[in-house]
A protein has these predicted regions:
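Short conserved loop adjoining the S-adenosyl-L-methionine
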Residues: 106-111
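A conserved beta-strand element that flanks and buttresses the S-adenosyl-L-methionine
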Residues: 118
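Class I SAM-dependent methyltransferase SAM/SAH-binding core
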Residues: 54, 60-105
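Conserved beta-strand signature within the Rossmann-like core of class I S-adenosyl-L-methionine
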Residues: 144-152
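Short alpha-helix
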Residues: 175-192
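A short glycine-rich, Lys/Arg-flanked "PGG" loop and its adjoining helix->strand segment in the class I
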Residues: 133-145
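Conserved class I S-adenosyl-L-methionine
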Residues: 1-47
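Short catalytic micro-motifs in class I SAM-dependent methyltransferases
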Residues: 121-125
Length: 219
């Protein structure tokens, strides 16, 4: 278990509000949010329009309305940060959205209890493979079928520009953002018992942001 994630809230005080404001500060950030919402919508629709879904970590709730627009009836917004959850409560499309204080490393939900789980903008903060596998195993345990994961990956202009920049030092738990190679992260998905259904690039050939739609392999 990664103690730094479970015991340290990175977004207390005004940090959560500042995070929310950052993604609405100019045309570029607003367009990126819109594109991220669009690829999430594609993944939800391709998964067969699930009835229940969880967004973990939900952050400030920027993606919650997408689930409702796709017909999700039972929606849970989950995050390890109480600061993020306070902001997310006000971003909920309706009061029926459940709010859960829990960690992606130890999700307080029963096995096979959610049709579709989205884990967005999280995995590129995990520099240690064991942490990534812990999170993948938890997502697989709680999901009935599909998981969507977004992160930074290579094969685009933004990653090419960063090619000579040394990566931040590896730390256990939630750390600085790292561009993960697709030939590194995709085998980890397979090792965790998923198959890759599809992937969606937020800004193809330009941005590092990619969303993977995964499906639990039948045993």
């Amino acid at each position: 278990m990664t103690e730094s994630i479970d015991q340290h809230d990175h977004y207390l005080g005004d940090r959560a509000k500042n995070y929310s404001a950052h993604h609405d500060k100019n045309l570029r950030t607003r367009l990126t949010t819109r594109q991220e919402q669009a690829v999430l919508r594609k993944a939800i629709e391709k998964s067969g329009r699930p009835k229940s879904a969880m967004d973990i970590p939900c952050g400030t709730g920027r993606f919650l309305s997408v689930f409702r627009d796709c017909g999700v009836a039972e929606l849970t917004a989950a995050d390890a940060s109480t600061g993020m959850l306070e902001v997310a409560k006000h971003a909920r499309p309706d009061d029926a959205v459940s709010v859960l204080h829990t960690s992606a490393f130890d999700i307080e939900m029963p096995n096979n209890s959610i049709d579709f789980i989205a884990c967005l903008r999280f995995f590129h903060h995990l520099s240690v493979k064991e942490d990534r596998m812990q999170a993948l195993n938890e997502l697989k345990r709680v999901s009935r079928k599909h998981v969507a994961i977004s992160l930074w990956t290579n094969g685009n202009l933004a990653s090419f520009r960063r090619r000579n920049k040394p990566p931040p030092p590896a730390v256990s738990g939630y750390g600085k953002r790292i561009c993960r190679r697709s030939d590194e992260i995709e085998p980890e998905f397979l090792d965790a018992g998923f198959k890759i259904v599809d992937h969606y690039d937020v800004w193809p050939m330009i941005s590092m942001w990619r969303l993977y739609l995964l499906q639990i392999e039948e045993t």
